[in-house]
Regions:
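Conserved short histidine dyad/triad with adjacent acidic residue
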Residues: 20-25, 38-53, 160-164, 179-194
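Short acidic-glycine-tyrosine-enriched beta hairpin
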Residues: 73-88, 214-230
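Short, conserved beta-strand element in jelly-roll/cupin
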Residues: 40-43, 52-69, 107-109, 181-184, ...
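A short hydrophobic beta-strand segment most commonly corresponding to one strand
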Residues: 85, 100-118, 226, 241-259
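Asparagine-centered strand-capping/turn motif at beta-strand->loop junctions
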Residues: 95-97, 236-239
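A short, N-terminal "cap"/entry segment at the start of jelly-roll beta-barrel domains
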Residues: 1-34, 116-176, 260-277
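Structural motif
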Residues: 66-68, 75, 91, 101, ...
Length: 277
């Protein structure tokens, strides 16, 4: 049986042994989303083009690798766990200076594909760019997950997530919310819906069962899942030993309250037995 709510697997793309940097947009207008999710793998020391987006902000998280961000004339050190907002119109780039391929997941907010971002390319980044003195970021948003405190969510509203953090939201001036969730074995985010916004999430690692409407599907590291606003959904960790790590975006909602969160009830034993895709 096919799934109603898009689940896109990028595991092979992420783990490909190719020696080339690569970029993919697994969620876009093709799946009915008004926000585009991207996945970017950069090889060590590859020099990209500077670029900007005239029509949208870019939100991203660096999941693997380290190096340097460019933002206008600034050069900022980049490390795992960095969550970043690049304002529309700001020229930017990332160079991976680690010894392994980096992984960045991000979102072009309110743009249904790359063309709709108003992308414009500049010159190639040079070695002189990388030699520029590193500084603190001035403009946009940059915060590391390690500097963000876990939220104290109400378990009575279905939040049985072990560690839930909101690195980007209206608290630091963003009209969308970037979240990172860790589900230890047995943890669950019970049935709920968002009346006011779509949700896109990416499974960094782990294995679980996801519900979306009538869909019941096993998810694992490398899956993107798109949830339309108003659709009941949930996530349960199926592993006895490993956590699930998830990062996602509440598109166009600057807080959990702004999503129009509605608790819908328990995930039942029958739910956990079912598979529809």
């Amino acid at each position: 049986m096919s799934l109603i709510h898009p689940l896109i697997d990028v595991k092979e793309f992420v783990e490909n042994n190719s020696c080339k940097s690569r970029f993919i947009t697994p969620i876009s207008g093709d799946q009915g989303s008004s926000t585009t999710a991207f996945c970017s793998v950069s090889m060590p020391h590859d020099l990209p083009h500077r670029h900007l987006h005239t029509s949208c902000d870019e939100i991203s998280i660096l999941i693997r690798g380290e190096g340097v961000y460019g933002l206008g004339d600034q050069r900022i050190s980049a490390r795992v766990g960095d969550c970043r907002v690049v304002p529309k119109g700001a020229e930017h780039f990332f160079v991976n200076e680690s010894g392994e391929p980096s992984l960045m997941v991000g979102f072009f907010v309110g743009a249904e594909d790359v063309a709709a971002t108003g992308i414009a390319y500049g010159d190639l980044v040079t070695k002189d760019d990388l030699a520029t003195l590193r500084s603190e970021q001035d403009g946009g948003i940059l915060i590391n997950l390690g500097d963000v405190q876990p939220e104290n969510m109400d378990q009575g509203d279905g939040w049985l997530i072990t560690d839930f953090r909101l690195p980007i939201s209206t608290r630091n001036g963003c009209s969308s919310t970037l979240f990172r969730a860790r589900f230890m074995p047995g943890a669950v985010h019970k049935k709920h819906r968002h009346e006011n916004c779509d949700e896109i999430y990416y499974i960094i690692s782990g294995r679980g069962l996801a519900g979306a409407g009538s869909d019941r599907v096993e998810v694992r590291g490398g899956h993107f899942h798109f949830i339309h606003k108003g659709v009941e959904h949930w996530l349960h960790n199926l592993s006895d030993t490993e956590p699930i790590e998830v990062v996602g975006l509440y598109c166009g909602a600057g807080s959990v309250a702004d999503t129009g969160y509605v608790y819908m009830g328990d995930v039942t034993p029958d739910d956990l037995k079912a598979r529809t895709g």
